[in-house]
Swiss-Prot record:
Subcellular location(s) per record: Cytoplasm; Nucleus; Melanosome
Modified residues (Phosphothreonine): T103, T240, T779
Record carries keyword Acetylation: yes
Cross-link (Glycyl lysine isopeptide (Lys-Gly) (interchain with G-Cter in SUMO2)): K513
Stated name of the protein: Staphylococcal nuclease domain-containing protein 1
One GO cellular component, as annotated: RNAi effector complex
Enzyme Commission number(s): 3.1.31.1
Length: 910
């Protein structure tokens, strides 16, 4: 027991009973109480105390199941009110008690006082005073305690309290109901509304016996969604507790036993009712989980009405802290770094219906399996034709629908990946093939769990696990709920309808079938297709939905590096850049919807033609990225000009297949200026910077996407491996990375080193300059150097104009240009070259208005008169505009024509 105290007294008098203390655990009846001590490292000891000198009615007792002829014993009058009086007064309270008598059978009789000493309320006297117990007959009032009991009884009689009231007390006898004929109907009739109840018995931490009020149904309630360690019954009838079973039972007893609670009846299982017990101090289900006394169980967690995710979170809390039953717990992803547990990646391929291939920010590829789901399977595989080759995608019911759902939803998109567990590699057995190590994860896009969406459409099923198997989806309950909905609604695999059949003809390499299809495909013009496989940069396998066939497709007009091939007796090595070309094509078109134009076929039955993705010609893209060369057969194609233009641009960059390209020397012929005509070939550019001397920097719009991709990859790389401050020693002329005022990193070139705190840099892709401390600089990785992508900012000057020498006038002109064209797209045409930079005319993209001519019209600049014949028409237009500005006395001309006297002095020429 918790503690004891010895009352004082003279050594010569009668022995004074020892005062002991405890906490009321349970009230057995109006005169029998169980007292327990304080817990110390486990459930405390307990003892039954029978109140001395009084008697209360016996509570109802159910007949023993081993005695078929026995009958249930009902409550005696006023027995239940007496029990309730003590229950409400004493449960969980600290009391003190004395033992006055102990029988040979071990029954103890004594007095119980509410509080810490015998000055507290005498429980026996209170019972008698309320008319809920009587003084035992035959007891002689020979001591003060018995005298007080007699007085209390007389007072109760006089006040007609309890059993001394009129009537026989039959209204206090409960109509106890030990069985329920239809538990399911009983549960449903309460519509999951809380029912008042008293917990009468705790079998283990998660199973209790409850008295439902006001109808007195005595039912066994199992807590929904969890299971505590239990007591295993041995052959000799004894019970052996599982680890922490006794502790879990005490945890529930100390909080719920004989407490007033509310129970939500949620379902039933084997005549036992599943429910959730609500107490003002909290939810015992969640508390048991959080303290490590229970684990979640899949078979009943779905009926838990207060949110299964709360139970999983509570269990996870205990697991992470290795509390009690989880003391030896090891997380499925314990060996993974946080960056490997959660990351964002781009989906590159869908593998059947339960796995995807993603591209990480590092550029690496990784296969991710969707946690806890199983793709459609072929039923009755033993009955299949052994000679027929199985094509899972088309022959397994709903596999194609599942793959298409994932393909359309995910391909090319960025998804959030949360790794749930790593399934280790397993060797092959007689019935199960070998499996390599698998990374299983929850994949979401736009907040949607892809596995859950698949299951809800009936395109996958949920794997059932052993209860102790923790390697499962972190959203396993949602998957189970989604599957239940799919079954209820008859979706997909759970449908009673006829299974969809996909009759897809594979004519790859079948020359005869290919010849039959060729005329149809040629006449069809552009046909829709899905790229199913990429063999090399220019060789693909396509699925044509309208024709429901698979074909091998070769890109026309190009010569792509050949990959490695396995030949009889040897392996033929691939040509340089063959792997890069294959990867380029894969990343661009694999499992994408494309359009194809079939022109012809080869001897092996492979179709030859043009493939378009998002309006771009794949052949042209491969040539543009220096991964293919133009083939002479392209001459008769309408795409020949585009191919040649792309090849010429690739040659100039001298990358990949053109890395060793040497331009053939051409004898230079000086043209006669009078015979040359002005060439007007405007190209789209993006103006990024205007300098103080009215030069400007532009980016080529056609290569803008390459720059965006490089910047994204570079910043991801920097985020993963940030430069160490001060570790970079800048040198003049060196390329580096610099952190701009917006906090982002850009490619730059060191122009001047004044001191470690003053480094002059030039941003090579934008044309602006800045002075920075060396702490905001870092080494430029070779993966993002100018060899990978040349500097994108090119400097130009306006043709046909003279920039004012006066500082204020020049500032006005620069400000006007900044307002009009900085950070906008324009059209640029190179007019003539000079020692500094090319001189160009620039047009607004929308109105096609000449920017330089506009400056002349505003009187902000003067015309530079050139003598070349091809420019005379343009010069005349500029001079006319200048005369108009002069007449209107705009800006430079506001004081008239100043050039007559001081033109030479100020650097102007007429």
């Amino acid at each position: 027991m918790a503690s004891s105290a010895q009352s004082g007294g003279s050594s010569g008098g009668p022995a004074v009973p020892t005062v002991q203390r405890g906490i009321i655990k349970m009230v057995l009846s109006g005169c029998a109480i169980i007292v327990r001590g304080q817990p110390r490292g486990g459930p405390p000891p307990e003892r039954q105390i029978n109140l001395s000198n009084i008697r209360a009615g016996n509570l109802a007792r159910r007949a023993a199941a081993t005695q078929p002829d026995a009958k249930d014993t009902p409550d005696e009058p006023w027995a239940f009110p007496a029990r309730e009086f003590l229950r409400k007064k004493l449960i969980g309270k600290e009391v003190c008690f004395t033992i006055e008598n102990k029988t040979p059978q071990g029954r103890e009789y004594g007095m119980i006082y509410l509080g810490k000493d015998t000055n507290g309320e005498n429980i026996a006297e209170s019972l008698v005073a309320e008319g809920l117990a009587t003084r035992r007959e035959g007891m002689r009032a020979n001591n003060p305690e018995q005298n007080r009991l007699s007085e209390c009884e007389e007072q109760a009689k006089a006040a007609k309290k309890g059993m001394w009231s009129e009537g026989n007390g039959s209204h206090t006898i409960r109509d106890l109901k030990y069985t329920i004929e239809n538990p399911r109907h009983f549960v449903d009739s309460h519509h999951q509304k809380p029912v008042n109840a008293i917990i009468e018995h705790v079998r283990d931490g998660s199973v209790v016996r409850a008295l439902l009020l006001p109808d007195y149904y005595l039912v066994t309630v199992m807590l929904s969604g969890i299971k505590c360690p239990t007591f295993r019954r041995e052959a000799d009838g004894s019970e052996t507790p599982e680890p922490f079973a006794a502790e879990a039972k005490f945890f529930t007893e100390s909080r719920l036993l004989q407490r007033d609670v509310q129970i939500i009846l949620e379902s039933c299982h084997n005549q036992n009712i599943l429910g959730t017990i609500l107490h003002p101090n909290g939810n015992i289900t969640e508390l048991l989980l959080k303290e490590g006394f229970a684990r979640c169980v899949d078979w009943s967690i779905a009926v838990y009405t207060r949110g299964a995710e709360k139970l999983r979170a509570a269990e996870r809390f205990a697991k992470e802290r290795r509390l009690r039953i989880w003391r030896d717990y090891v997380a499925p992803t314990a060996n993974l770094d946080q960056k490997d547990k959660q990351f964002v990646a781009k989906v590159m391929q869908v593998l059947n219906a339960d796995a995807i291939v993603v591209k990480l920010n590092s550029g690496d590829y990784k296969t991710i399996h969707l946690s806890s789901i199983r793709p459609p399977r072929l039923e009755g595989e033993n009955t299949q034709d052994k000679n027929k080759k199985l094509r899972p995608l088309y022959d397994i019911p709903y596999m194609f629908e599942a793959r298409e759902f994932l393909r359309k939803k995910l391909i090319g998109k960025k998804v959030n990946v949360t790794v749930d567990y790593i399934r280790p590699a397993s060797p092959a057995t007689e019935t199960v093939p070998a499996f390599s190590e698998r990374t299983c994860a929850t994949v979401t896009i736009g907040g949607i769990n892809i596995a859950e969406a698949l299951v809800s459409k009936g395109l996958a099923t949920v794997i059932r696990y052993r209860q102790d198997d923790d390697q499962r989806s972190s959203h396993y309950d949602e998957l189970l709920a989604a599957e239940a909905r799919a079954i209820k609604n008859g979706k997909g695999l759970h449908s009673k309808k006829e299974v969809p059949i996909h009759r897809v003809a594979d004519i790859s390499g079948d020359t005869q079938k290919a010849k039959q299809f060729l005329p149809f495909l040629q006449r069809a013009g552009r046909s829709e297709a899905v790229v199913e496989y990429v063999f090399s940069g220019s060789r693909l396998k396509l699925y044509l939905p309208k024709e429901t066939c698979l074909i091998t497709f070769l890109l026309a007009g190009i010569e792509c590096p050949r990959g490695a091939r396995n030949l009889p007796g040897l392996v033929q090595e691939g040509e340089p850049f063959s792997e890069e070309a294959t990867l380029f094509t894969k990343e661009l078109v694999l499992q994408r919807e494309v359009e194809v134009e079939v022109e012809s076929m080869d001897k092996a039955g492979n179709f030859i033609g043009w493939l378009h993705i998002d309006g771009a010609n794949l052949s042209v893209l491969l040539v543009e990225h220096a991964l293919s060369k133009v083939h002479f057969t392209a001459e008769r194609s309408s795409y020949y000009k585009s191919l040649l233009s792309a090849e010429e641009a690739a040659k100039q960059k001298k990358e990949k297949v053109w890395a060793h390209y040497e331009e053939q020397p051409v004898e230079e012929v000086m043209p006669v200026l009078e015979e040359k005509e002005r060439s007007a070939s405007y190209k789209p550019v993006f103006v990024t910077e205007i300098t103080d001397d009215l030069h400007f920097y532009v980016q080529d719009v056609e290569t803008g996407t390459q720059l965006e991709k490089l910047m994204e990859n570079m910043r991801n790389d920097i985020a993963s491996h940030p430069p160490v401050e001060g570790s970079y020693a800048p040198r003049r002329g060196e390329f580096c990375i610099a952190k701009f005022v917006d906090g982002e990193w850009y490619r730059a070139r060191v122009e001047k080193v004044e001191s470690p705190a003053k480094i002059h840099v030039f941003y090579i892709d934008y044309g602006n300059r800045e002075v920075l401390p060396s702490t905001r600089l870092g080494t430029l990785s070779p993966a993002f150097s100018t060899r990978v992508l040349p500097a994108q900012a090119t400097e130009y000057a306006f043709a046909f104009i003279q920039v004012p020498q006066d500082d204020d006038a020049r500032t006005d002109a620069v400000d006007s240009v900044v307002r009009d064209i900085q950070n906008t797209q324009c059209l640029l045409n190179v007019e003539h070259l000079s020692a500094g930079c090319p001189h160009v005319t620039l047009q607004f993209a929308d109105s096609k208005g000449d920017v330089g001519l506009g400056l002349v019209k505003e009187g902000l600049v003067m015309v530079e008169v050139r003598k070349e014949k091809q420019f005379q028409k343009v010069i005349t237009e500029y001079l006319n505009a200048q005369e108009s500005a002069k007449s209107a006395r705009l800006n430079l001309w506001r004081y008239g024509d100043f050039r007559a006297d001081d033109a030479d002095e100020f650097g102007y020429s007429r």
